Swiss-Prot record:
InterPro entries: MFS, MFS_dom, MFS_Efflux_Transporters, MFS_trans_sf, Sugar_effux_transptr_put. This is Probable sugar efflux transporter. It holds the Pfam family MFS_1. It is found in: Cell inner membrane. The gene is sotB. It comes from the Bacteria. It is a multi-pass membrane protein. The chain crosses the membrane at residues 15-35, 50-70, 81-101, 103-123, 136-156, 170-190, 209-229, 246-266, 276-296, 298-318, 333-353, 365-385. The lineage of its organism: Bacteria, Pseudomonadati, Pseudomonadota, Gammaproteobacteria, Pseudomonadales.
Amino acid sequence: MDSTSETRSGSWLSVIALALAAFIFNTTEFVPVGLLSDIGHSFEMPTSQVGLMLTIYAWVVSLASLPMMLLTRNIERRKLLVGVFLLFIASHVLSGLAWSFQVLMLSRIGIAFAHAVFWAITASLAVRVAPPGQQAKALGLLATGTTLAMVLGIPLGRVVGEALGWRTTFMAIAGLSVLTLLYLARSLPLLPSQNSGSLRSLPMLFRRPALVCLYVLTVVVISAQFTAYSYIEPFAKQVAQMSGEATTLLLLLFGGAGIFGSILFSRYSEAFPRGFLLAAILALGSSLALLLPLSAQPTWLMALSLLWGMSIMCFGLAQQSRVLRLASDATDVAMALFSGLYNVGIGAGALLGSVVSERMGLASIGNVGAALALAGLLLALFAALRYAEALKTTSL
């Protein structure tokens, strides 16, 4: 094998390692979605209150992303990822041993700090280690790891939780994380900090109106998504009257659809940059609006989950790609902000979903989410017209 082939092969192995890590982190962030009822039963709490663990987790990530990125900006990236995983593993062990909801929340906060650093640097690292000219495919592979968390991680976490208890799910994640850590340490090259930026980068980034608009759009649309998705498990069981097995299948279909979303992104986002994003938001809003009307027909609800899963994946990838392009001179700061604001949306959506569930009923989570998605669509239309030149391409 020549040196060029070795370099390219090594680069792809590094991207695969990061995709595997993305699978782990996204699995643990959202696996409580499939375990809300079981966790609530263990601590004698309603699911609307247990769901707030999603809000607290997400908001810790949002608050910690930028400070943690700045504190670690001079640390070699492979060493930093190893440290992140050690905290991640220890916190999962505590989750599995949690003797109260407060201890469970403490462990989740530890995981959230690890998450904050991981997602602030991972997308830019995937682009750095990818073979020349393959940056978009590297992001697509990273997205595949994220998607597989939805396809396999969350449903399997639910299956394990139902069979062996939710604590076993967290312990299993800790075990898989150990294997992933060993793979990361072996496959990643030395990665000195590069284009990480500093606090001086913030005024520069906020003077880019197209970028600021993307950030606001992310918060609005992700809030819409998680108003409904955070409580899809109790919605499926209580409103749609689906069995536990059917609910697991619903989560499986939602996650699996994300694979097709990443394929659509790879093929069409650069050819139709404005239309692609608008179509993704429109499809998301339509999915949320149809959640209640189709709940009486489980088959149609499962079909709807395919459109829903594809649309949110397309939206997330399109936003991430644009942020990286619009802030190529301060990628780590820009992605820390993106990760933080994405989690502001997750937390806001989970909180809003909790309020809606308690005051209006679980049946209303889709309609409220759809209203937010409509606001996001209008904002995206404004951005497409106002910042057409800056947003005309998503290429890296």
